[in-house]
A protein has these predicted regions:
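Solvent-exposed soluble domains appended to multi-pass membrane proteins
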Residues: 6-9, 13-230
Length: 230
C-alpha cells in the first residue's frame, strides 16, 4: 500500500482570489502546477484567525464542530480522556504505521496528549527537531518538515500515514515590515487604508511555504516508494 502524507498548511490560501491586488511574481507556482496536474479544490474550515486544532479535528474525524458547544475545542475537552474514531485508526486497521508531525510546541492545544487518542503511534513536535530556522516573527519555517518526513518514512519497513501540521504562516502579521527583512514579493494595487505591510509579509511566508511543498514533492518523487500527498 502507498504511504499517505496529509499536509495541513498554516493559514494558507490562494491570494489570486483577492480581486485587483497584484504581485511582483507568482506567489504559489508549485501549488498551481500541482493543482493543474492532479485533483484539486477548496476546503471550508471551521475557524478564522485562530483554532487550527478544530480544523485538524474535523479533517481527521469527519465530525462537525457544530455537534459541540459554542467555542469548544475537543482537543481541550473530550479528547483529554476519550478515544475517537479517525483516519489514523482506520489506516492502522489496514496495517499502516501512523504518525503526527508538527513544527511547533507539542503541548500547544494538548497535542502531546490528544494524538494518541486519535490513533497515532508517534508524535514528533519541534522539541525533537534540530537545525530549526525561524521566520522574522519567531515561527519555525516549514522547510524543516521535509527532512522530518524522511526520517519517519525511513523508520518503518511498511506503509506510513503521516499527518503533518505546518506553522510558518501563523500570525500575528506585523503592521511594519520587520527590520532587515527584505521580502521577495512586492504587493501592488492594495486596498486604501488596509494593512499592506502585514499582507505583504503574509504573502512572502506562503511563498516560502509553496517552495517547501515543491521540495517535498521533489523528494517524494525521487524516493523508491509509492506515496500519496494530500
Amino acid at each position: 500500500a502507498p504511504n499517505i502524507i496529509f499536509l495541513q498548511l498554516e493559514s494558507f490560501f490562494n491570494p489570486d482570489r483577492v480581486k485587483k491586488v497584484k504581485f511582483s511574481q507568482d506567489v504559489l507556482p508549485n501549488m498551481k502546477r500541482l493543482s493543474s496536474e492532479y485533483s484539486a479544490g477548496y476546503i471550508s474550515v471551521p475557524c478564522f484567525g485562530a483554532g487550527t486544532a478544530n480544523t485538524e479535528f474535523e479533517v481527521q474525524t469527519g465530525i462537525n464542530l457544530d455537534d459541540f458547544g459554542p467555542g469548544e475545542y475537543p482537543y481541550k475537552t473530550v479528547l483529554q480522556s476519550a478515544i475517537c474514531e479517525s483516519a489514523a485508526y482506520d489506516l492502522k486497521n489496514l496495517g499502516y504505521s501512523t504518525h503526527a508531525l508538527h513544527n511547533n510546541d507539542g503541548t500547544f492545544y494538548n497535542r502531546n496528549k490528544v494524538f494518541s487518542h486519535l490513533g497515532y503511534d508517534t508524535f514528533t513536535s519541534i522539541e525533537y527537531m534540530s537545525d530549526i530556522e525561524y521566520n522574522p516573527i519567531g515561527w519555525a519555517k516549514d522547510s524543516i518538515l521535509t527532512g522530518e518526513i524522511a526520517k519517519i518514512l525511513d523508520s518503518t519497513e511498511g506503509s506510513d500515514y503521516i499527518y503533518t501540521i505546518s506553522v510558518q504562516g501563523h500570525g500575528d502579521y506585523p503592521s511594519q515590515m520587520p527590520e532587515n527583512y527584505n521580502p521577495e514579493i512586492k504587493v501592488e494595487n492594495f486596498f486604501d487604508g488596509a494593512d499592506k505591510a502585514a499582507f505583504e509579509y503574509y504573502i512572502n511566508q506562503i511563498h516560502e511555504m509553496d517552495k517547501f511543498v515543491g521540495e517535498l514533492v521533489k523528494y517524494l518523487s525521487e524516493r523508491d516508494e509509492q506515496t500519496i500527498l494530500v
